[in-house]
Amino acid sequence: MTDQELGITESKEHNPGEWYAEVVQKAGLADYAPMGGFIVTRPRGYALWERLQDHLDGWFKETGVQNTYFPMFIPESYLEREKDIVDGFDPEVAWVTHGGHDELEERLAVRPTSESIITPFIAEWVRSYRDLPLRVNQWCSVVRWEATETKPFFRTKEFLWQEGHTAHATEESAWDETMTRLEQYERLYEEVMAIPGMTGRKPEHDKFPGADTTTTIEALMPDGKSVQAGTSHYLGTSFAEAFDIEYTDEDETKQTAHTTSWGLSWRALGALIMTHSDDQGLVIPPALAPTQVVVVPIWQADTEEAVKEYAADLAAELDEQFRVELDDRDERNPGFKFNEHELQGVPLRIEIGPNEVEDEAATLVHRPDGESDVAERESITDAVDEALETVYAKLYASAEATLEENIRKAHGRGEILGTLGQHGGYVKTGWCGDEACEAEIKDEIAAEIVMLPLDEDEPPVYDTCGVCGDEATETAYFAKSY
């Protein structure tokens, strides 16, 4: 890549769509596939997904979840056993009708989600209350044939995700499960991705098909749009009834199980890129960065040996605790290396020149803002640890400020539309519960109710609906969304 090719030419502030696409490609995260709606995930992009997966998978296993894998094809008859699934996903289902030249006796759906193939097996595995709770998860891809413009990680017909499925003896146990997973998603965004999230629940008309309650974590992007960052569904007994998940309780009485499902996709990577990156390229929080620290030696002919040796020793020491790269390439000058590692989002750069060697020191440069510090060589590990914590804190503080500055109240159709149109972000208003009131706003400005408060008993922010003026029963958060 040449110096000209290396730079980001689009502006995040003025042209966020083109800027985002340029960062994704030039930072080596993904390319566009020859088929519309699909992308090729490059090694650096997949490494981000693996880091995210490692965190989440570890937490799942700590709370009793076991990984499994189910076929990507689902018989049509299985989908039809849960009517809400059919109605909810039918327009987006990709169908396999032939095997080679032979027409199949029954169409096979390429999984849009896996409740319909996993739940029948849970029914086989559960016989007694002793088998509950049962918790399984799979990391896989799903296909939803949406007629939307391709936006890597945000909107693709095929995407990677995890989907968890559980069965429980009681509503209380299943609801606790639903909240546990939502809290883990929130933890992932806040502690690992440095993105504050807002948790809530979806309105009745926007729940997962067949769910009793859909909870969500929403993340606000710098362009004022909301991202549905992860969802956790309490499914009640609807799926258990459709697929005969019954168990014998302690009194030898047949009971119907309560089930949950929960999922997070690589849309999280889209949120990560959009939130933190800048006009120099990708910015990644240290916990997710494939390379956390890059050591760049800077030498002249008469100092090359000493500088390289010093830098290599320092990198080797740091590599025991951090993910470190030593960039001692001869064919690239320091300026090119700095720009390249900034483009790729390495959180911390360490510069080693003759002065650092002489002073037994190192210059540490933070990726988010270019702030630099000089650390003593003997305490370099502690200095790097502190610097990475500072980088995380800077990223979180910036994202938190964006969120706090973009939650507003509005009442009345004109004020809601005006606030959304001028500022974007979230607009809180009273809502009567009628989908038609949401439709008025959605038709006018393409904003929708992205969430309601988790606590159904929380008093509405206004006594009357912000759209129709009838009595309000909820606080609704309107936003434009990805």
From Swiss-Prot:
Transmembrane segments: none annotated. It holds the Pfam family HGTP_anticodon. Signal peptide: none annotated. GO terms for molecular function: ATP binding; proline-tRNA ligase activity. One of its GO terms (biological process) is prolyl-tRNA aminoacylation. It is found in: Cytoplasm. InterPro entries: aa-tRNA-synt_IIb (IPR002314), aa-tRNA-synth_II (IPR006195), aa-tRNA-synth_II/BPL/LPL (IPR045864), Anticodon-bd (IPR004154), Anticodon-bd_dom_sf (IPR036621), Pro-tRNA-ligase_IIa (IPR002316), Pro-tRNA-ligase_IIa_arc-type (IPR004499), Pro-tRNA_ligase_II_C (IPR016061). It catalyses: tRNA(Pro) + L-proline + ATP = L-prolyl-tRNA(Pro) + AMP + diphosphate. It is an enzyme of class 6 (ligase). Keywords: Aminoacyl-tRNA synthetase, ATP-binding, Cytoplasm, Ligase, Nucleotide-binding, Protein biosynthesis. Its EC number is 6.1.1.15. GO terms for cellular component: aminoacyl-tRNA synthetase multienzyme complex; cytoplasm. Consists of three domains: the N-terminal catalytic domain, the anticodon-binding domain and the C-terminal extension. Homodimer. Catalyzes the attachment of proline to tRNA(Pro) in a two-step reaction: proline is first activated by ATP to form Pro-AMP and then transferred to the acceptor end of tRNA(Pro). Belongs to the class-II aminoacyl-tRNA synthetase family. ProS type 3 subfamily. This is Proline--tRNA ligase. It comes from Natronomonas pharaonis (strain ATCC 35678 / DSM 2160 / CIP 103997 / JCM 8858 / NBRC 14720 / NCIMB 2260 / Gabara).
